[in-house]
């Protein structure tokens, strides 16, 4: 008798939970108050299960998609999914596939839009220009110049991505032989094994 009651309770619980799950799955993407940007990045999450994409820039927002785990391409070299970064808010980045063959996967309600929120802690980028500025504009004061006799900006490790605005991304990075600095970099790329394409100047 107890077994039958438990079975009925489980079935009823599933039925009651279904409308809520469906409502979460169809929750519209929240973009109010976010910045707009046009930069690129890649996934850095070490979790073998990958990362969740959410409907809003907060950890308790409904999950609407998934970023696949990083791939080991040999000799302890890992690469993550690449994507466009089109917005930011409160330490979260709004990421976008860019094309139908992109690595990001979405539920049916959000697949056509192809955007979702990913924690900035799980995102990396490759810097393209030497100037690191105090604000996301060309005339802002320099924080650091990421270049030396034998190295350039794409040789610098980005330890954290914070936000983005326009064609700029805000990062913490460490110049070779220097201390960590935080600032804004112009037009980063998502290359992980090679340098960024040339021809871009701030």
Regions found by a protein language model. Give the residues of each.
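N-terminal secretory signal peptides and thylakoid transit peptides that target proteins
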Residues: 1-15
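Short linear motifs in intrinsically disordered/low-complexity regions
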Residues: 3, 46-48, 73, 77, ...
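Acidic, low-complexity intrinsically disordered regions
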Residues: 7-8, 74, 88, 113, ...
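N-terminal signal peptide c-region/cleavage motif recognized by signal peptidases
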Residues: 18-20
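Boundary regions of SH3-family modules and the immediately adjacent low-complexity/disordered segments
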Residues: 24-40, 87-139, 163-202
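Beta-loop motif signature
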Residues: 25-39, 45-89, 125-164
